[in-house]
């Protein structure tokens, strides 16, 4: 039997950081709260605006993009956190992040001096693993070609 009520436990969790509804529900289930009590606690949190998936999604995108994570991987991670697709798309469109500039910064950090086909493939895989699309990498290759012309 849990020590605190589900609402009190939610307040405790949300006082530390934002959570998605899905994550909160899982935490309450792990603590073995009753299903009705879980539903009541989550409704209470949403009514009082303690928990908001839209706000969580926006802050998650800001935070992870600062770590060099691209839009594709962000979508995947947010889906795993139980955020609905329409919310993810909306927040990615509303964000002021320039994904091409972010890809350039990341690319410059990791780009080796020696440039050959193997290195190009390795960098392409790296950028894909970070969640960037092929169009971002194509943009980087265009910039690379332009910089070689001026050398």
UniProtKB/Swiss-Prot annotation:
The keyword Cell cycle does not apply. One of its GO terms (biological process) is regulation of DNA repair. GO terms for cellular component: cytoplasm. The keyword Hydrolase does not apply. InterPro entries: RecX_HTH_1st, RecX_HTH_2nd, Regulatory_RecX, WH-like_DNA-bd_sf. It comes from the Bacteria. Gene3D superfamilies: Winged helix-like DNA-binding domain superfamily/Winged helix DNA-binding domain. It is found in: Cytoplasm. Pfam families: RecX_HTH1 (PF21982), RecX_HTH2 (PF02631). Its main location: cytoplasm. Keywords: Cytoplasm. Belongs to the RecX family. Modulates RecA activity. This is Regulatory protein RecX. It comes from Haemophilus ducreyi (strain 35000HP / ATCC 700724).
